[in-house]
Amino acid sequence: MYSFADVDNSLKQHRLIKKINISTFGFSRGAALARAFTNQFMWQCESDCNGLSYGTGKYPIEFKFMGIFDTVASFGLPATSLNNNLTFDGRDMVIDERIKMCVHHVAGNELRFAFPVDLIHKGNGQIANPNWKELVYPGMHSDVGGGYTPGSQNVN
């Protein structure tokens, strides 16, 4: 696992870098981690009139795309009070408006209470950036993420 200092040291070795483009992807809790990682990375950047820059080399950086599938930010055992220190606070799940494009695929028929989805729209139902899309698909959480094998589900 790299720290931000490791990333900065690696960048110093490549003096021909003109711009850093970042895209993140994830399903379920991985989508929550993609959102949190992107925010943590953005908080390490400096912002000016030209956009974002990163590291001691002030490399221009752009967060191009976030592809997330049915974000679930709950960690640990459902319906327990165990504190596992793996919960996110509200700002970790907020998608920064400087992300150029975001697509979030969401399960429309999830019934399990342990899989609450964290939508990308604000509380008022509006999406912050017109280049972002939240698409609802029929099925449950693992239908969206591809976890069920064909023919493994039955109606009874």
Regions found by a protein language model. Give the residues of each.
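Glycine-rich nucleophile elbow surrounding the catalytic serine of serine-hydrolase chemistry
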Residues: G26-A36
